[in-house]
Amino acid sequence: MPELPEVENVRRTLENLVTGKTIEDVIVTYPKIVKRPDDAEIFKEMLKGETIENIKRRGKFLLLYVTNYVIVSHLRMEGKFLLHQEDEPIDKHTHVRFLFTDGTELHYKDVRKFGTMHLFKKGEEMNQMPLADLGPEPFDAELTPQYLHERLQKTNRKIKVVLLDQRLLVGLGNIYVDEVLFRSQIHPEREASSLTAEEIERIYEATVTTLGEAVKRGGSTIRTYINSQGQIGSFQELLNVYGKKGEPCVTCGTILEKTVVGGRGTHYCPICQPRI
Protein backbone atom coordinates (compact mmCIF):
# COMPACT_ATOMS: atom_id res chain seq x y z
CA MET A 1 0.00 0.00 0.00
CA PRO A 2 1.37 3.46 -0.84
CA GLU A 3 2.30 5.25 2.38
CA LEU A 4 3.05 8.94 2.90
CA PRO A 5 6.29 9.08 0.85
CA GLU A 6 4.72 7.33 -2.11
CA VAL A 7 1.52 9.40 -2.04
CA GLU A 8 3.52 12.62 -1.72
CA ASN A 9 5.53 11.72 -4.81
CA VAL A 10 2.34 10.89 -6.70
CA ARG A 11 1.01 14.29 -5.65
CA ARG A 12 4.07 16.16 -6.85
CA THR A 13 4.28 14.44 -10.21
CA LEU A 14 0.53 14.51 -10.80
CA GLU A 15 0.27 18.21 -9.99
CA ASN A 16 2.89 19.00 -12.62
CA LEU A 17 0.96 16.98 -15.20
CA VAL A 18 -2.65 18.09 -14.77
CA THR A 19 -2.84 21.50 -13.06
CA GLY A 20 -4.81 23.89 -15.25
CA LYS A 21 -6.53 21.17 -17.28
CA THR A 22 -10.32 21.35 -17.64
CA ILE A 23 -12.48 18.23 -17.36
CA GLU A 24 -14.70 17.68 -20.39
CA ASP A 25 -16.09 14.33 -19.30
CA VAL A 26 -15.61 11.55 -16.76
CA ILE A 27 -15.98 7.85 -17.52
CA VAL A 28 -16.44 5.46 -14.59
CA THR A 29 -16.38 1.76 -15.43
CA TYR A 30 -16.25 0.49 -11.83
CA PRO A 31 -18.77 2.62 -9.88
CA LYS A 32 -17.91 1.10 -6.47
CA ILE A 33 -14.74 3.21 -6.40
CA VAL A 34 -16.91 6.34 -6.08
CA LYS A 35 -18.09 6.50 -2.47
CA ARG A 36 -19.52 10.04 -2.48
CA PRO A 37 -21.91 10.86 -4.00
CA ASP A 38 -23.61 7.48 -3.93
CA ASP A 39 -24.35 7.65 -7.64
CA ALA A 40 -21.30 7.65 -9.95
CA GLU A 41 -23.40 9.40 -12.62
CA ILE A 42 -23.83 12.39 -10.30
CA PHE A 43 -20.07 12.33 -9.61
CA LYS A 44 -19.45 12.56 -13.35
CA GLU A 45 -21.91 15.40 -13.94
CA MET A 46 -20.57 17.48 -11.03
CA LEU A 47 -17.04 17.36 -12.44
CA LYS A 48 -17.82 18.33 -16.03
CA GLY A 49 -16.39 21.77 -16.82
CA GLU A 50 -14.28 21.86 -13.63
CA THR A 51 -10.62 22.89 -13.88
CA ILE A 52 -7.91 21.28 -11.75
CA GLU A 53 -6.37 24.05 -9.63
CA ASN A 54 -3.93 22.17 -7.41
CA ILE A 55 -3.33 18.85 -5.69
CA LYS A 56 -2.66 18.41 -1.98
CA ARG A 57 -2.11 15.49 0.33
CA ARG A 58 -3.55 14.61 3.73
CA GLY A 59 -1.89 11.55 5.18
CA LYS A 60 -2.26 8.82 2.56
CA PHE A 61 -5.06 10.66 0.75
CA LEU A 62 -4.71 12.70 -2.44
CA LEU A 63 -6.85 15.84 -2.63
CA LEU A 64 -7.53 17.04 -6.17
CA TYR A 65 -8.88 20.59 -5.95
CA VAL A 66 -11.01 21.65 -8.91
CA THR A 67 -13.01 24.84 -9.44
CA ASN A 68 -15.82 24.12 -6.98
CA TYR A 69 -15.04 20.72 -5.50
CA VAL A 70 -12.39 18.45 -4.01
CA ILE A 71 -11.82 14.84 -5.06
CA VAL A 72 -10.47 12.92 -2.05
CA SER A 73 -8.75 9.80 -3.36
CA HIS A 74 -7.20 6.88 -1.49
CA LEU A 75 -4.99 4.61 -3.59
CA ARG A 76 -5.26 1.63 -1.20
CA MET A 77 -3.09 -1.27 -2.39
CA GLU A 78 -2.51 -0.73 -6.10
CA GLY A 79 -4.12 2.56 -7.20
CA LYS A 80 -2.30 4.73 -9.75
CA PHE A 81 -2.99 8.00 -11.58
CA LEU A 82 -1.37 8.22 -15.02
CA LEU A 83 -1.78 10.73 -17.85
CA HIS A 84 -2.52 9.44 -21.36
CA GLN A 85 -3.30 10.74 -24.82
CA GLU A 86 -6.87 10.13 -25.95
CA ASP A 87 -5.83 7.71 -28.69
CA GLU A 88 -3.76 5.43 -26.44
CA PRO A 89 -5.02 1.92 -25.59
CA ILE A 90 -7.00 1.69 -22.35
CA ASP A 91 -5.62 -0.73 -19.79
CA LYS A 92 -8.16 -3.28 -18.52
CA HIS A 93 -7.48 -2.13 -14.96
CA THR A 94 -8.46 1.48 -15.72
CA HIS A 95 -11.66 2.20 -13.80
CA VAL A 96 -12.00 5.99 -13.91
CA ARG A 97 -11.01 8.29 -16.79
CA PHE A 98 -10.97 12.08 -16.57
CA LEU A 99 -11.14 13.40 -20.14
CA PHE A 100 -9.64 16.87 -20.56
CA THR A 101 -10.47 19.50 -23.16
CA ASP A 102 -6.89 19.41 -24.51
CA GLY A 103 -7.24 15.79 -25.63
CA THR A 104 -5.35 14.19 -22.75
CA GLU A 105 -6.87 11.83 -20.19
CA LEU A 106 -6.09 11.10 -16.55
CA HIS A 107 -6.59 7.40 -15.87
CA TYR A 108 -7.11 5.89 -12.44
CA LYS A 109 -5.85 2.30 -12.58
CA ASP A 110 -6.34 -0.20 -9.78
CA VAL A 111 -5.69 -3.92 -10.16
CA ARG A 112 -7.25 -4.73 -6.80
CA LYS A 113 -10.15 -2.25 -7.09
CA PHE A 114 -9.75 -1.23 -3.44
CA GLY A 115 -9.23 2.50 -4.07
CA THR A 116 -11.86 5.10 -3.19
CA MET A 117 -12.98 8.56 -4.32
CA HIS A 118 -15.11 11.01 -2.38
CA LEU A 119 -16.32 14.31 -3.85
CA PHE A 120 -16.92 17.29 -1.56
CA LYS A 121 -17.71 20.95 -1.98
CA LYS A 122 -14.61 23.00 -1.19
CA GLY A 123 -14.32 23.67 2.51
CA GLU A 124 -16.26 20.58 3.57
CA GLU A 125 -13.60 17.94 3.02
CA MET A 126 -11.61 18.27 6.26
CA ASN A 127 -14.66 18.03 8.52
CA GLN A 128 -16.12 14.85 7.06
CA MET A 129 -15.01 11.27 6.71
CA PRO A 130 -12.60 9.98 5.61
CA LEU A 131 -10.47 13.00 6.64
CA ALA A 132 -12.18 14.18 9.82
CA ASP A 133 -10.50 11.81 12.29
CA LEU A 134 -6.94 12.00 10.97
CA GLY A 135 -4.07 12.89 13.27
CA PRO A 136 -1.30 15.42 12.58
CA GLU A 137 1.12 15.27 9.68
CA PRO A 138 4.63 14.00 10.55
CA PHE A 139 6.25 17.24 9.37
CA ASP A 140 3.80 19.63 11.08
CA ALA A 141 4.58 21.57 14.24
CA GLU A 142 1.61 19.89 15.94
CA LEU A 143 3.48 16.59 16.05
CA THR A 144 5.97 16.72 18.92
CA PRO A 145 7.47 14.19 21.34
CA GLN A 146 5.16 15.60 24.01
CA TYR A 147 2.11 15.02 21.79
CA LEU A 148 3.14 11.39 21.31
CA HIS A 149 3.99 10.91 24.99
CA GLU A 150 0.58 12.13 26.15
CA ARG A 151 -1.24 9.73 23.85
CA LEU A 152 1.00 6.68 24.08
CA GLN A 153 0.83 6.68 27.87
CA LYS A 154 -2.94 6.19 27.66
CA THR A 155 -2.97 2.90 25.76
CA ASN A 156 -1.70 -0.62 26.36
CA ARG A 157 -1.92 -1.53 22.70
CA LYS A 158 1.27 -2.72 21.03
CA ILE A 159 3.35 0.14 19.71
CA LYS A 160 3.23 -1.08 16.11
CA VAL A 161 -0.56 -1.19 16.19
CA VAL A 162 -0.68 2.31 17.64
CA LEU A 163 1.68 3.79 15.05
CA LEU A 164 -0.44 2.32 12.26
CA ASP A 165 -3.49 4.12 13.66
CA GLN A 166 -4.01 7.17 11.44
CA ARG A 167 -5.84 8.93 14.27
CA LEU A 168 -2.55 9.25 16.17
CA LEU A 169 -0.52 10.54 13.25
CA VAL A 170 -0.90 10.07 9.53
CA GLY A 171 1.24 8.51 6.85
CA LEU A 172 2.85 5.49 8.46
CA GLY A 173 2.04 2.06 7.05
CA ASN A 174 3.53 -1.39 7.42
CA ILE A 175 6.84 -0.63 5.69
CA TYR A 176 7.73 2.56 7.51
CA VAL A 177 6.50 1.50 10.95
CA ASP A 178 8.92 -1.44 10.83
CA GLU A 179 11.73 0.88 9.76
CA VAL A 180 10.91 3.51 12.38
CA LEU A 181 10.84 0.96 15.20
CA PHE A 182 14.16 -0.53 14.06
CA ARG A 183 15.79 2.90 14.03
CA SER A 184 14.23 3.58 17.44
CA GLN A 185 15.43 0.21 18.82
CA ILE A 186 11.90 -0.54 20.02
CA HIS A 187 10.33 -4.00 19.80
CA PRO A 188 7.08 -3.84 17.79
CA GLU A 189 5.16 -5.72 20.50
CA ARG A 190 6.06 -3.38 23.36
CA GLU A 191 3.00 -1.91 25.04
CA ALA A 192 2.80 1.77 24.16
CA SER A 193 2.28 2.79 27.79
CA SER A 194 5.55 1.09 28.79
CA LEU A 195 7.67 3.41 26.67
CA THR A 196 9.86 5.98 28.37
CA ALA A 197 10.04 9.63 27.35
CA GLU A 198 13.47 8.97 25.83
CA GLU A 199 12.14 6.05 23.77
CA ILE A 200 9.23 8.13 22.53
CA GLU A 201 11.68 10.86 21.55
CA ARG A 202 13.53 8.27 19.46
CA ILE A 203 10.30 7.21 17.76
CA TYR A 204 9.50 10.84 16.95
CA GLU A 205 12.94 11.51 15.48
CA ALA A 206 12.93 8.26 13.50
CA THR A 207 9.48 8.98 12.09
CA VAL A 208 10.39 12.43 10.81
CA THR A 209 13.80 11.34 9.51
CA THR A 210 12.67 8.11 7.85
CA LEU A 211 9.68 9.63 6.09
CA GLY A 212 11.69 12.67 5.03
CA GLU A 213 14.40 10.50 3.50
CA ALA A 214 11.83 8.29 1.78
CA VAL A 215 10.09 11.29 0.21
CA LYS A 216 13.41 12.52 -1.19
CA ARG A 217 14.14 9.08 -2.64
CA GLY A 218 10.79 8.89 -4.41
CA GLY A 219 9.27 6.39 -1.99
CA SER A 220 9.74 2.62 -1.90
CA THR A 221 8.89 0.39 -4.84
CA ILE A 222 8.36 -2.99 -3.19
CA ARG A 223 5.90 -4.44 -5.69
CA THR A 224 4.24 -2.24 -8.30
CA TYR A 225 4.45 1.34 -7.00
CA ILE A 226 5.24 4.07 -9.54
CA ASN A 227 4.57 7.81 -9.41
CA SER A 228 2.37 9.59 -11.95
CA GLN A 229 5.29 9.93 -14.36
CA GLY A 230 5.82 6.16 -14.32
CA GLN A 231 8.99 6.36 -12.19
CA ILE A 232 9.82 3.91 -9.40
CA GLY A 233 11.14 4.93 -5.99
CA SER A 234 14.54 3.99 -4.58
CA PHE A 235 14.13 4.05 -0.80
CA GLN A 236 13.66 0.27 -0.86
CA GLU A 237 17.44 0.14 -1.30
CA LEU A 238 17.82 1.68 2.17
CA LEU A 239 15.32 -0.49 4.07
CA ASN A 240 16.89 -2.09 7.13
CA VAL A 241 14.32 -4.69 8.15
CA TYR A 242 11.14 -4.66 6.07
CA GLY A 243 11.01 -7.71 3.81
CA LYS A 244 14.38 -8.95 5.08
CA LYS A 245 13.45 -11.95 7.23
CA GLY A 246 16.41 -14.33 7.47
CA GLU A 247 18.99 -11.71 6.51
CA PRO A 248 21.65 -10.38 8.92
CA CYS A 249 20.91 -7.17 10.81
CA VAL A 250 22.87 -4.24 9.39
CA THR A 251 23.76 -3.17 12.93
CA CYS A 252 24.61 -6.35 14.85
CA GLY A 253 24.57 -9.19 12.31
CA THR A 254 21.81 -11.14 14.07
CA ILE A 255 19.35 -12.86 11.74
CA LEU A 256 16.23 -10.73 11.33
CA GLU A 257 12.90 -12.24 12.32
CA LYS A 258 9.30 -11.87 11.22
CA THR A 259 6.17 -12.13 13.31
CA VAL A 260 2.57 -10.98 13.10
CA VAL A 261 1.44 -7.93 15.06
CA GLY A 262 -2.13 -6.71 14.75
CA GLY A 263 -2.60 -8.95 11.75
CA ARG A 264 0.35 -7.40 9.91
CA GLY A 265 3.62 -9.07 8.95
CA THR A 266 6.30 -7.45 11.09
CA HIS A 267 10.09 -7.47 10.68
CA TYR A 268 12.56 -6.74 13.46
CA CYS A 269 15.94 -7.54 15.00
CA PRO A 270 15.62 -9.54 18.26
CA ILE A 271 18.87 -8.06 19.60
CA CYS A 272 18.62 -4.41 18.57
CA GLN A 273 14.91 -4.35 19.45
CA PRO A 274 14.66 -6.35 22.69
CA ARG A 275 11.24 -7.17 24.08
CA ILE A 276 11.71 -5.83 27.57
From Swiss-Prot:
Belongs to the FPG family. It catalyses: Hydrolysis of DNA containing ring-opened 7-methylguanine residues, releasing 2,6-diamino-4-hydroxy-5-(N-methyl)formamidopyrimidine; 2'-deoxyribonucleotide-(2'-deoxyribose 5'-phosphate)-2'-deoxyribonucleotide-DNA = a 3'-end 2'-deoxyribonucleotide-(2,3-dehydro-2,3-deoxyribose 5'-phosphate)-DNA + a 5'-end 5'-phospho-2'-deoxyribonucleoside-DNA + H(+). Involved in base excision repair of DNA damaged by oxidation or by mutagenic agents. Acts as a DNA glycosylase that recognizes and removes damaged bases. Has a preference for oxidized purines, such as 7,8-dihydro-8-oxoguanine (8-oxoG). Has AP (apurinic/apyrimidinic) lyase activity and introduces nicks in the DNA strand. Cleaves the DNA backbone by beta-delta elimination to generate a single-strand break at the site of the removed base with both 3'- and 5'-phosphates. A zinc finger (FPG-type) spans 240-274. This is Formamidopyrimidine-DNA glycosylase. One of its GO terms (biological process) is base-excision repair. Monomer. Binds 1 zinc ion per subunit. InterPro entries: DNA_glyclase/AP_lyase_DNA-bd (IPR015886), DNA_glyclase_Znf_dom_DNA_BS (IPR015887), Formamido-pyr_DNA_Glyclase (IPR020629), FPG_cat (IPR012319), MutM-like_N-ter (IPR035937), Ribosomal_uS13-like_H2TH (IPR010979), Znf_DNA_glyclase/AP_lyase (IPR000214), Znf_FPG/IleRS (IPR010663). It comes from the Bacteria. SMART domains: Fapy_DNA_glyco (SM00898), H2TH (SM01232). Its cofactor is Zn(2+). DNA binds at H93, R112. The keyword Hydrolase applies. GO terms for molecular function: 8-oxo-7,8-dihydroguanine DNA N-glycosylase activity; class I DNA-(apurinic or apyrimidinic site) endonuclease activity; damaged DNA binding; zinc ion binding. Keywords: DNA damage, DNA repair, DNA-binding, Glycosidase, Hydrolase, Lyase, Metal-binding, Multifunctional enzyme, Zinc, Zinc-finger. Its EC number is 3.2.2.23, 4.2.99.18.
